[in-house]
């Protein structure tokens, strides 16, 4: 499988989320370092069993018909393996893959240039496809359905459009915000796959595989401790595994025990539930300063010294999903689970996690 990457302007800059150890967004050179951990065939991809079965059937049918498969949309939270699956599809089909992203395509002409250079059967992977400019989206509609692009020749009133026929290819789009895709674009995808957060047992298997690739000797219970702290996200699991590997190297450990995992990740202020310093600060402020809530977002953000957007988009989704926090019309409320996690006896009227 040949891979061509054109990310261009896809770097959105450092922010609070990208600096956290438990961020589901890539940090630093992680996209490159993740390459050694990526499986190359669908059978080696751990987790998402229903999706894998659907995708295997989809690819097998395309191979038997001897035609490029329909376009594929991979939707789900960041860090779950959308890029890896795109690479696997191209590898299974034994065709090259061209890689770009929504932010990298600044003009429709950028996308037209990529499309016009594709060969028959080639895969075009567009990460963050929901961030394509509107003009590029409209060009992509036609290319995906009719396999042609209209090239503008000349300028001003004398300009004319010349249709350029394209070879049959497959677009794989990845998005963390499927709802932001316009309906005409969604309709062009013949197969849509939704990736879910990983349960602890599947994440544990993934960590054991990654540890074997990285040469980390995990003792009994160590992979489980890592899985518990990884927020159901393979990208986070692999990142934490690397930090534990650093710990093992520095301390000359032959085997990494579960206590070593706890001690190593405590250094980064990551607790047994995968909560970090900022998560704990948010819960602590609600419980101690606002008696469990409700508290408005702006007041809460001011109390922890962060922007309101950071609290709302970086901290709250995981806290709500894991039952530590409830959003109400009156504000944020800490659940009984949050109180007990902080080691504080909850009030009698405190909400239980849903």
UniProtKB/Swiss-Prot annotation:
CC per GO annotation: cytoplasm; Holliday junction resolvase complex
Biased composition (Polar residues): 1-27
GO biological process, one term: DNA repair
Residue ranges of the region described as Large ATPase domain (RuvB-L): 4-198
Catalytic reactions on record: ATP + H2O = ADP + phosphate + H(+)
Keyword presence, DNA damage: yes
Region of interest (Head domain (RuvB-H)), residue spans: 272-354
Principal place of residence: cytoplasm
Residues noted as binding Mg(2+) in the record, renumbered to the chain: 83
Keywords: ATP-binding, Cytoplasm, DNA damage, DNA recombination, DNA repair, DNA-binding, Hydrolase, Nucleotide-binding
EC number: 3.6.4.-
Small ATPAse domain (RuvB-S): annotated segments: 199-269
MF-aspect GO terms: ATP binding; ATP hydrolysis activity; four-way junction DNA binding; four-way junction helicase activity
Binding site for ATP: 37-38, 79, 82-84, 145-147, 188, 198, 235
Domain of life: Bacteria
Positions contributing to DNA binding: 327, 332
UniProt region (Disordered), positions on chain: 1-35
Compartments where found: Cytoplasm
Similarity-based family: Belongs to the RuvB family.
UniProt domain comment: Has 3 domains, the large (RuvB-L) and small ATPase (RuvB-S) domains and the C-terminal head (RuvB-H) domain. The head domain binds DNA, while the ATPase domains jointly bind ATP, ADP or are empty depending on the state of the subunit in the translocation cycle. During a single DNA translocation step the structure of each domain remains the same, but their relative positions change.
Subunit field text: Homohexamer. Forms an RuvA(8)-RuvB(12)-Holliday junction (HJ) complex. HJ DNA is sandwiched between 2 RuvA tetramers; dsDNA enters through RuvA and exits via RuvB. An RuvB hexamer assembles on each DNA strand where it exits the tetramer. Each RuvB hexamer is contacted by two RuvA subunits (via domain III) on 2 adjacent RuvB subunits; this complex drives branch migration. In the full resolvosome a probable DNA-RuvA(4)-RuvB(12)-RuvC(2) complex forms which resolves the HJ.
Protein task: The RuvA-RuvB-RuvC complex processes Holliday junction (HJ) DNA during genetic recombination and DNA repair, while the RuvA-RuvB complex plays an important role in the rescue of blocked DNA replication forks via replication fork reversal (RFR). RuvA specifically binds to HJ cruciform DNA, conferring on it an open structure. The RuvB hexamer acts as an ATP-dependent pump, pulling dsDNA into and through the RuvAB complex. RuvB forms 2 homohexamers on either side of HJ DNA bound by 1 or 2 RuvA tetramers; 4 subunits per hexamer contact DNA at a time.
Protein name: Holliday junction branch migration complex subunit RuvB
Organism listed in the record: Bifidobacterium longum subsp. infantis (strain ATCC 15697 / DSM 20088 / JCM 1222 / NCTC 11817 / S12)
Lineage: Bacteria, Bacillati, Actinomycetota, Actinomycetes, Bifidobacteriales
Protein's gene: ruvB
């Amino acid at each position: 499988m040949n891979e061509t990457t054109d990310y261009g302007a896809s770097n959105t800059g450092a922010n609070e989320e990208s600096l956290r150890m438990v961020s589901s967004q890539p940090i630093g050179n992680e996209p490159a370092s993740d390459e050694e951990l990526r499986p190359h065939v669908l059978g080696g991809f751990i987790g998402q069993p229903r999706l894998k079965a659907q995708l295997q059937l989809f690819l097998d049918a395309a191979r038997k018909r001897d035609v490029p498969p329909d376009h594929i949309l991979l939707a789900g939270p960041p860090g779950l393996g959308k890029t890896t699956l795109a690479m696997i599809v191209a590898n299974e089909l034994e065709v090259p893959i061209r890689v770009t992203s929504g932010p990298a395509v600044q003009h429709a002409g950028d996308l037209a240039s990529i499309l016009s250079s594709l060969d028959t059967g080639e895969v075009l992977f567009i990460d963050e496809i929901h961030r394509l400019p509107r003009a590029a989206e409209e060009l992509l509609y036609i290319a995906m359905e009719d396999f042609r692009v209209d090239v503008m020749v000349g300028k001003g009133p004398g300009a004319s459009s010349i249709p350029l026929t394209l070879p049959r290819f497959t677009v794989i789009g990845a998005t963390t915000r499927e709802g932001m895709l316009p309906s005409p674009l969604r309709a062009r995808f013949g197969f849509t796959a939704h990736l879910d957060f990983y349960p602890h047992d599947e994440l544990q298997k993934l960590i054991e595989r990654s540890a074997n690739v990285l040469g980390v000797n995990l003792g009994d219970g160590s992979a489980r401790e890592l899985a518990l702290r990884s927020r159901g996200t393979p990208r986070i699991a692999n990142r934490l595994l690397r930090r534990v590997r650093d710990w093992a190297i520095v301390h000359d450990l032959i085997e990494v025990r579960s206590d070593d995992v706890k001690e190593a990740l405590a250094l980064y202020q990551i607790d047994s539930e995968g909560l970090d310093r900022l998560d704990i600060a948010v819960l602590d402020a609600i419980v101690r300063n606002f008696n469990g809530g409700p508290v408005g977002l702006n007041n809460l953000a001011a109390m922890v010294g962060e922007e309101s957007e950071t609290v709302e988009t970086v901290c709250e989704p995981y806290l709500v999903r894991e039952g530590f926090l409830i959003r109400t019309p009156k504000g944020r409320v800490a659940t009984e689970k949050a109180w007990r996690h902080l080691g504080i006896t909850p009030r009698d009227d405190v909400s239980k996690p849903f």
